[in-house]
Amino acid sequence: MLLTLRVQGARHWLKSTRCLASSAAPAKSPSSPPQLEVSGSTYATDGWTNVTPKILSYVGANKHLQTDHPLSIIRQRIVNYFYGAYRNQRGNPLFSVYDQMNPVVTVQQNFDNLLIPADHVSRQKSDCYYINQQHLLRAHTTAHQVELISGGLDNFLVVGEVYRRDEIDSTHYPVFHQADAVRLVTKDKLFERNPGLELFEETWSGTLADPKLILPSSKFMDQTKQPCHTLEAVKLMEHEMKHVLVGLTKDLFGPRIKYRWVDTYFPFTQPSWELEIYFKDNWLEVLGCGIMRHEILQRSGVHQSIGYAFGVGLERLAMVLFDIPDIRLFWSNDSGFLSQFSEKDLHNLPKYKPISHYPQCTNDLSFWLPQDIEVDAGFSPNDFYDLVRSVAGDMVEQISLVDKFKHPKTGKSSVCFRIVYRHMERTLTQAEVNEIHKQIASASVDSFNVQIR
């Protein structure tokens, strides 16, 4: 979520403008144990299991709750803003906050409940960390929406870590943090000053079977409104949502920040927008939001309300507000890093001062893929990135696929990855890097049946 962060376009919410594809589950890896224990529960593994011990080690770290941590500071700023923006008649905050929810969710919670198509690329093993075919580490905190709405909540924030298989560089990490919010209102509340107006069109039947309600999950969906809602209801809800989110943005970035709204598509909201700010001569995406799809509310047992939702990445905000250059720093326990931040004054956001600049070490790794296997057709670079993380941990700063080659005679494909090593807290020797590099090469042979060039 970032000047370079811009390429991350939707770390806060699942994007749906990527190509649709399907992926069959391969046989279970021989390295997977028969069972995994995560967050106090035991799960049987199967052919979908791809979560690694390295990734599981992050579960329960709760960096967003760690005192004097930059992510905790951003979390508190967001929570405090919503506490102030919405209060009941007694002056108490309307929004409740859930920041320790179990990150293990079902496929239904993460995808089906949010109307994400069955063939959407975000469901693939190459994108998510699956515990088994029915359970995964949540890819977004939006996964808890139906659960909380079904429990009777109508104004809430969910904050926590989310997990995505991704590339390796200074702005991508397999675990990051999101804040998600939902606000629902009834007709009486929305039209308090205009009691003659309605939430829903007279022609709408109010059932899930209504073909006017069930729309294909397409980025060409009507950006004006959903068929069930009246235009008046949508416009009032849109106005409130945008007013509140612009207020949040100004609270974080200052009252004179330049901003703009951009139409977009999310499977779970319609219409949908992204909020961008003009920062250091670039437009920077800050958050995604929209009017909640009414199908989601109906599945939650709510039939007479309209709502908005938004999602934002905490790292995205913190990297900009604190001038933190590398996303790995959020996982550092170095006192030289952590001592720079304090929760005593949440509105005094210090700029990060580098502890030291350690040199990079760069090594290339080239290998032949097995016969009839190609990149993104049997071999996913994300699988290689996970392997590297498991072997080298945070000593790897960046990986890039720098070359692909198909032999004209044998038909075999070759790839070359450039791996940049740099520790955040000390200097790495070339000999140390070479040893780690050998371990990565050996693990690649064992895991992918490749031939090192």
Swiss-Prot record:
Its EC number is 6.1.1.20. Substrate binds at T142, A143, H144, Q145, R164, T171, H172, Y173, Q178, A179, D180, E285, F310. Is responsible for the charging of tRNA(Phe) with phenylalanine in mitochondrial translation. This is Probable phenylalanine--tRNA ligase, mitochondrial. Residues 1-27 form a transit peptide. GO terms for cellular component: cytoplasm; mitochondrial matrix; mitochondrion. It holds the Pfam family tRNA-synt_2d. It is found in: Mitochondrion matrix. It is an enzyme of class 6 (ligase). Residues 356-453 form the FDX-ACB domain. Keywords: Aminoacyl-tRNA synthetase, ATP-binding, Ligase, Mitochondrion, Nucleotide-binding, Protein biosynthesis, Transit peptide. SUPFAM superfamilies: Anticodon-binding domain of PheRS, Class II aaRS and biotin synthetases. The keyword rRNA-binding does not apply. CDD domains: PheRS_alpha_core (cd00496). Belongs to the class-II aminoacyl-tRNA synthetase family. It catalyses: tRNA(Phe) + L-phenylalanine + ATP = L-phenylalanyl-tRNA(Phe) + AMP + diphosphate + H(+). Its main location: mitochondrion. One of its GO terms (molecular function) is tRNA binding. GO terms for biological process: phenylalanyl-tRNA aminoacylation; tRNA processing. The gene is PheRS-m.
